């Protein structure tokens, strides 16, 4: 594979990492809201935040798997050159 294609793949990998980092930041913000709810309970908001937290966690796991698979593909391409 030519170097331009590898650079394109590495750029895509950086974007995937950015997506994962953004999702992790969302989880952190959700955790802040959940913590605030200890002082000001709101059952509906707590339930919504639990769902949002789970969805964001699932997204992080999915993106992490995609990143791992994509890194393997990049490494295989680098080796095959």
Q: Which stretches of residues belong to each language-model region?
A:
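Short, structured coil/loop segments at alpha-helix boundaries
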Residues: 2, 6, 39-46
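N-terminal acidic leader/helix
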Residues: 2-35
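Amphipathic alpha-helical coiled-coil segments
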Residues: 23, 55-73
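General "foldedness" signal
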Residues: 26-30, 44, 51, 63-66, ...
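Long amphipathic alpha-helical coiled-coil segments
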Residues: 36-41, 67-81
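Short, glycine/alanine-rich amphipathic alpha-helical segment
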Residues: 41-59
């Amino acid at each position: 594979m030519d170097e331009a294609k590898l650079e394109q793949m590495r750029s895509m990998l950086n974007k995937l990492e950015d997506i994962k980092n953004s999702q992790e930041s969302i989880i952190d913000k959700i955790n802040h809201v959940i913590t605030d709810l200890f002082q000001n309970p709101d059952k509906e908001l707590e339930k919504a935040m639990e769902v949002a937290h789970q969805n964001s966690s699932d997204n992080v796991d999915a993106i992490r798997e995609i990143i791992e698979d994509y890194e393997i593909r990049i490494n295989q391409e680098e080796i095959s050159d």
